[in-house]
Amino acid sequence: MVVESSSSPIIPGLTDDVAELCVSKIPRSSFQITSQVCRRWRSFLRSQHFAAVRKLTGTVEEFLCVLMESECGRDVYWEVFDASGNKLGQIPPVPGPLKRGFGVAVLDGGKIVFFGGYTEVEGSGINSTTVSASADVYEFDPANNSWRKLAGMNIPRYNFAFAEVNGLLYVIRGYSTDTYSLSNAEVYNPKTNQWSLMHCPNRPVWRGFAFAFSSKLYAVGNGSRFIDIYDPKTQTWEELNSEQSVSVYSYTVVRNKVYFMDRNMPGRLGVFDPEENSWSSVFVPPREGGFWVRLGVWNNKVLLFSRVCGHETLMYDLDKEKGSKWRVCDQIKPSASQLASVLINF
């Protein structure tokens, strides 16, 4: 029997720096097999150094991470798909109790950040509950397949708008404990692991959504026709009259356009072009047995997930040469109801 040594070469006959470049070319869909080659390979594939080598050689891959909820609503877990639609397994659940009204974003291209939300606490009355907002923030690093707790927000909040702009994470408005409406915002700097409170226009809106465009933060409040635009360079807000009021419950951004599901437009997918300040919509195929509930993005295409577990996912093809159209996405088949999805590069 050959005993492995920690100093054994990654590939016999090659220096480790050359061998690392070779191994970094292996697609992640093959990691389960290649990690069984030897202990040295397994250790290298799971290391932060391996992730750095892949980034250096430009061999990072894009993965769709889907947060799902079981039918009973008690179990929440993540499933991961690669660019070909291969299901690569699950990532560990977010620490702490199950939350609603949370935010999920991606920083540094490959780290998932889960922040805020609320839990329900039983009240003293019959069938009564109170809402407890959370300021907790957790970060998932795919290099070591684990979560770690980051600095918490200054104010616990849920049902807020959020977006990443130039590497910084912004959360806007929302609600705190006892459904107290918030009229401020916060910004997180991952380099310093600090949150800073910031002013934002006070609008009586219900959640809404936010996105980045031209290095600026766009905040759209449900029930308001005004869009608040924040310029990080000048640290100032400006107001844009979009001339349309929305009630958005799910959205995604593809090719600098915002696609959204609006309670006021059943059977339609809304489209907002921030460059033209124009609104439009496209037909959404009806779904027997339930409503479309969440949007996502994969391979530069809009994904439409069903509320009902086991039903297929639809994909909206934005390729103008082929003509935009809906078709069934056979590759992406989540095993439960989708709550959120993000893309990471790793």
From Swiss-Prot:
Q: Does the keyword Repeat apply?
A: yes
Kelch repeat locations: 62-109, 111-167, 168-215, 217-257, 259-300
Residues in domain F-box? 9-56
Give the species.
Answer: Arabidopsis thaliana (Mouse-ear cress)
The family database entries (InterPro entries) matched by this protein are listed as: F-box-like_dom_sf, F-box_dom, Kelch-typ_b-propeller, Kelch_1
**CDD domains named among the record's database cross-references:** F-box_AtAFR-like
Name this polypeptide is given: Putative F-box/kelch-repeat protein At1g27420
Which keywords describe this protein according to UniProt?
A: Kelch repeat, Repeat
Pfam families referenced in this protein's UniProt entry, alphabetically: F-box, Kelch_FKB95
Q: Do the record's keywords include Repeat? A: yes
* Matches recorded under SUPFAM superfamilies: F-box domain (SSF81383), Kelch motif (SSF117281)
